[in-house]
Each structure stands twice: as C-alpha cells, then as structure tokens.
C-alpha cells in the first residue's frame, strides 16, 4: 500500500469517527423528540387523564431512557415516588419500535403492566403492539398433572380436594391457564405444586397434552410479541437452567428493562446457585408413588421407595434443625443457618448419605420400568439430579460461593450460591448489543448508586437520580424520639407499642407499624391490643400472618380505623394513597443480621479488600431498607403524614446523619407534643 493510500485510509477513518456520533446524535434526537411530544400537554398521554400535566422529573427520566435505547447502553435510574417511572420507561420503549423485555420483582406489578399500563399506553399512542405475559411454570395449570391428581385422589388436606374441583371447572374456560385468574386461590396453596409442572417433571413433547399446554402457549406468544413482561425470578432461573423461555427470547430483544431493580440482586442469588431440600424429596416421592401405581403397579415396592424418601427428608430436616428441634422452638418464618456449624455436627454427613442412598434406590427402580410411561424418564432425571446434589453438598463449595441452610416449619433446604450477580450480568452485557435500563425508587444513598451498581456488575453504566416531585417538607414530618429505649433494651418493643398506641389513637388508626423481626412483630401487636382494650378504643390491630398479605391490606383499606403491624414483606410494594394511612412507625434501624451466612460472607470479602464493612455494607443496607419503609407514607402529591423511627441511634450516632439523608426531606419534629399536634392537624383536615 502506498503512502498516499495510507493517508486516504486515515482520512476515511477520521470521517467515519466523526459521522458515527453525528448519526447517533440524530437517532437520539429523533426518539427524544417523539418522547417529549408524547409527554407534552397536548400530546397523546394527555388523553389518558383529564387533569394531566407534564412532570419535569418524568420527562427527565424518559429522555435518559430514550438516549440509552438509541445508543444501546446501560442506564441505572433511581426515581423517587411520584415521578411516574413506569410511563417514563414504557413510552420510549414503545416509540422506539424495538423489541422489549420488561422484568419486575413481583407478579402484582407484572400483571399491572400487562393488564393495565401497557394497554392504556398502546391505545393512547395508537401503536398496534403485540404484548405477551410470561411467568414461571408454577404459575400455570398443567393439564396432565391435573388429570393425574384426579386419578390418584391423594391430597394433603380436604381443602385441596375442593380446590381441585374448582380448578377443573376453571380449566374448561381458561385460555391462559394462569392461576392469577382464580380469585381467592393463594399462590402458596398446597394444591398448586400438585397441578402445575416443574422443569424436572415436565414430559415435554412426550406429553399427551403438549399441544394444549399453557406453558408452551405462553412461550410461543412471547416469541411472537414485540413487548414481553416477565419477572426477575424467571429471568435468572433461565440464565441458570435455560428452561423458562427467556433464553430463546433474549438474543432478539433490543431493550431490556428491569423495574423494582432493588430486588434484582437477591432474586439472582437465589437462582444462580444450587439447592437440595426436603420438599424436593417429598415431591419426588409423591410423584413416584402416583406414577408407579398408575403405570407399573407391582413392578416395584413404590410405597417402600416413597417411605425411604420421606425418612431421608425427615432426618435431613432434624439434623439441620439441630438443637432447635430438641428445644422445641416454634419457627414462624424461615431461619438462615450457618453451613459450617451444621455441617460439622454429628449425623449431618450420615443424613446426606441417607438422602443419596434413598435417591439411588429410586433411580434403580425407575430405570427398570422407564419404558412403561414417559413419566418414568423424568422421574429418573429428577432422582439423578438430586442424588448428584447430595454428593456435591458432601464436599467443599466452589471457590467464591457461599453455603447456608434455610430452615422453615415445613422443611430444610441446603443452598449454595454466588455472593452477587455481577458475573452473570457482565456475561449478559457482553452479549448481543441492546439497551439495558434498571430502575427503582431506592437504589443507593450515594451519587453512584453503588449499593446497586457494584453487586450488579454495572459500575460502568450511566447513573441518573431523579427526585420526587412531592413537597415532603410541607406534607411530611419525621419524629425520632430522644431518650427512647435502645433496641437492645428488653423493654424496647413494649415501648414501641406504647408510643404507637398513643399516636394511632390521635388518628383513630390509619397507622402502619413496621418491625424488623417477627419476635418484635408479635410483641408490638400484643401490646397494641392490650393498650386499646384498656382505653376502650375500637381500633383494630391487623397482624401479619393472621391472613394473606393482600387480605390484610384490603381489610386495612376497608377499615382505616385500624393499625397494621407487619414485618419484612410490608416494608415495600404496599400502596395506600390518600388519608387511609397517615402514620408509619419503624421499630428500629433495619441493619442486616450480622449472623446471616450471606451477610458474613459479603463482610469477609469487603474486609479482604481493605474496605470498611460497617460503612460500605451495613449502613448502606439499612439506608435502602429505611427508605423503602418510609416510602409507604406519602404516595401522592396530596398525601400527608408522620414517619416515626423508634431508634435513638438515628439521632445520636454519627451515621444517623447519613441515614436521615437517605430519607425524603421531611420536616423534623422535636418531641411527641409536636408529633401529636401534627397528627391532630391531619385528623382535623379529614373533618
């Protein structure tokens, strides 16, 4: 090549370098202008609401999302309550015309997007967009297993038998097979695993109901749609197992949006690891007995094989519970237990070996009759996978992974998982180019949103923080009682109940009490009932665990003259706008439990890096949880209320300033008299 041609090549490359950003800028401008016009006072979105007015924070976020889509970049957005983040990401995605995947943490938001928000926007924008909703297998009715359940006639209780009859009637008319269509059917109902499939027991194309399969239809519709709504669990389950239909979808997706992104890392950690639990053994035993009696009666002692699995499951739970079982301690939730303490106990290795042997016997029996029915091939695969897991848990974990044991009233589960999702997300970001958008109302308490971006592997993503348009200074008060008992004081929970009763009495209910532990929840709820009874107040106390979450919330909405006491699941995802909720009390600062095995492993990693684990982890986690809990109070621009944090460390410790800074800018009150005066003003305004 000559010198002249070298110069010509250099000129051409220079021109290309200049042209690419110009072309990208033009694309940016085109989509950004369309988005801006959509949000204009005379734009299509105004047709959705007679009182519509543009919101600057919403427009700011929508423009950032439009840029990320045009440039196929990663964007992380923390958008305060009231910004309207859902429309801020959906409008640019729809107007871009690109294939979009939207993922949520909860099925409730997933349903809201698919059933309400997206149809409204599509109508307003007049865009013929095909939508699809894709959930995990357990959300759909399996026709094959429903028929099996009727034939076997074995149910955990009478209620399950009645539920099956109702499901059979519904099966005749449902198009989607989504259990969410069945009002009153709790997603934790014991009938659901009986009439839904799992990756392990699905027969695939060998199933006689394959053509009518609801899971297959949902995945087919997702492959044909321009916008698909999934959830985080489904997304990560697919990265791990490649069994949910998302893997086939992702390569063709050009925009991936994750709402409720603050739950993304924990969802990923659950699914990127491995688990072996007593419930898996019991489920296998139930299916084994049903299939054995249906297709190979007399060929093997199916009842004996099931009994062996049940014994192994029972022994596994007992050895995992250890002294908790002998002490007769009643479990109300799930306990996370350290691996080394339990694995080093006498009998643990023997229990794992018993699981291995029971599964080996099942595998031998099933292989002998595997040609009798397609179900036996799946049973063999399940038995082999569980047997291999029992072998793996008997040796050291993979480098960089952490192990623990989940113990519940119903069973035990051995878990091995990575410490975060950074490696998995980096692999996705390095795949086919696409825009990645991650958003939530709470993603960090610093400018880089490092609480979220570090464990998610998004340190290089563009970061945007959009504040709430609400006037918190005028509409909300923050009360941190000075001189209050410390959380370590035995009388702390009782003092929380006493203060909550006085404040709730001023409002005649309309109060949430959020606790950090189930023990405090019980103490506070009991204390409130006692105080209200003594005073002759007709204020109801609604307690988490007394009924399903959505039932309790509906009772609170129907009767605001009540106090709802809830723990972890009530700190977020609860929306009570208006004057039905005007006071939120938090019992103490929500630091993560230091003895949690996952917390311990993360702390060790930070310390090995020479970092301050208390500042970089514990305070950061507490700030996020505190912000989530406080977010229950003000849900609309006209809401007013009082936030109370019953922890003197919030006012007295140096880190208290950082935690207060993580909250919306509420006006502080100095003492209970001022707090009561504010509540009296709110009560008077209701009339």
Regions from the language model: what does each represent?
Residues 2-48, 98-226, 233, 288, ...:
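A substrate-engagement module of RecA-like helicase motors
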Residues 25-77:
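Conserved pre-motif I regulatory segment
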Residues 66-67, 86-99, 116-120:
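Walker A/P-loop NTP-binding motif
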């Amino acid at each position: 090549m000559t010198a002249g041609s070298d110069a010509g090549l250099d000129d051409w490359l220079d021109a290309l370098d200049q042209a690419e950003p110009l072309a990208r800028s033009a694309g940016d401008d085109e989509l950004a202008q369309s988005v801006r016009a959509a949000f204009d006072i005379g734009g299509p979105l105004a047709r959705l609401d007679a009182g519509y007015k543009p919101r600057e924070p919403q427009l700011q976020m929508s423009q950032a999302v439009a840029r990320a889509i045009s440039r196929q970049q990663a964007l992380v957005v923390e958008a305060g309550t009231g910004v309207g983040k859902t429309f801020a990401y959906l409008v640019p995605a729809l107007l871009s015309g690109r294939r979009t995947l939207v993922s949520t943490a909860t099925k409730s938001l997933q349903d809201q997007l698919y059933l309400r928000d997206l149809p409204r926007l599509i109508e307003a924008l007049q865009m013929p967009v095909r939508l699809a909703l894709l959930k995990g297998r357990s959300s759909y009715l399996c026709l094959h297993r429903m028929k099996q359940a009727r034939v076997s006639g074995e149910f955990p209780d009478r209620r399950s038998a009645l539920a099956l009859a109702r499901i059979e009637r519904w099966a005749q008319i449902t198009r989607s097979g989504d259990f969410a269509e069945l009002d009153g059917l709790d997603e934790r109902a014991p009938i659901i695993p009986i009439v839904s499939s799992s990756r392990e027991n699905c027969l695939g194309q060998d199933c006689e109901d394959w053509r009518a399969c609801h899971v297959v239809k949902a995945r087919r519709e997702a492959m044909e749609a321009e916008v698909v709504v999934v959830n985080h669990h489904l997304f990560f389950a697919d990265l791990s197992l490649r069994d949910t239909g998302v893997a086939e979808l992702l390569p063709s997706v050009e925009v991936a949006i994750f709402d409720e992104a603050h739950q993304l890392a924990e969802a990923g950690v659950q699914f990127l690891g491995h688990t072996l639990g007593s419930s898996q053994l019991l489920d296998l035993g139930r299916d084994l007995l049903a299939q054995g009696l249906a297709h190979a009666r007399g060929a093997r002692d199916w009842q004996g094989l099931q009994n062996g699995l049940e014994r192994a499951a029972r022994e596994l739970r007992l050895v995992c519970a250890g002294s908790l079982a002998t002490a007769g301690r009643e479990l109300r939730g799930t306990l996370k237990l350290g691996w080394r303490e339990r694995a080093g106990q006498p009998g643990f290795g023997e229990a794992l070996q018993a699981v291995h042997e029971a599964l080996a016997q099942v595998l031998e029996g099933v292989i002998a009759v595997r040609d009798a029915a397609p179900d036996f091939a799946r049973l063999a695969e399940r038995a082999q996978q569980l047997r291999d897991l029992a072998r793996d848990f008997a040796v050291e974990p993979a480098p960089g992974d952490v192990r623990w044991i989940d113990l519940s009233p119903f069973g035990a589960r051995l878990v091995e998982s990575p410490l975060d999702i950074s490696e998995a997300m980096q692999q996705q970001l390095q795949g086919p180019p696409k825009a990645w958008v991650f958003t939530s109302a709470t993603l960090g308490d610093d400018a880089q949103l490092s609480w979220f971006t570090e464990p998610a592997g998004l340190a290089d993503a563009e970061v945007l923080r959009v504040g709430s348009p609400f006037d918190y200074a005028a509409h909300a008060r923050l009360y941190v009682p000075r001189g209050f008992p410390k959380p370590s004081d035995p009388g702390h929970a009782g003092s929380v109940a006493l203060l909550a009763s006085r404040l709730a009495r001023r409002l005649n209910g309309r109060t949430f009490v959020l606790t950090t532990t189930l023990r405090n929840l019980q103490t506070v709820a009991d204390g409130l009932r006692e105080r209200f009874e003594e005073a002759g107040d007709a204020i109801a106390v609604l307690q988490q665990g007394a009924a399903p979450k959505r039932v309790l919330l509906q009772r609170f909405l129907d009767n605001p003259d009540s106090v709802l006491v809830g723990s972890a699941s009530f700190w977020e995802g609860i929306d009570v706008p208006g004057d039905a909720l005007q006071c939120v009390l938090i019992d103490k600062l929500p630091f993560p439990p230091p003895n949690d095995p996952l917390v311990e492993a993360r702390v060790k990693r930070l310390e090995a890096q020479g970092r301050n684990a208390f500042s970089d982890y514990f305070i950061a986690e507490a700030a996020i949880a505190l912000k989530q809990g406080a977010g229950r109070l003000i849900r609309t621009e006209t809401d007013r209320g009082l936030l109370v944090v019953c922890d003197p460390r919030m006012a007295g410790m140096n880190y208290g300033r950082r935690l207060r800074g993580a909250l919306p800018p509420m006006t502080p009150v100095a003492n209970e008299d001022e707090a009561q005066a504010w509540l009296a003003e709110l009560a008077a305004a209701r009339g």
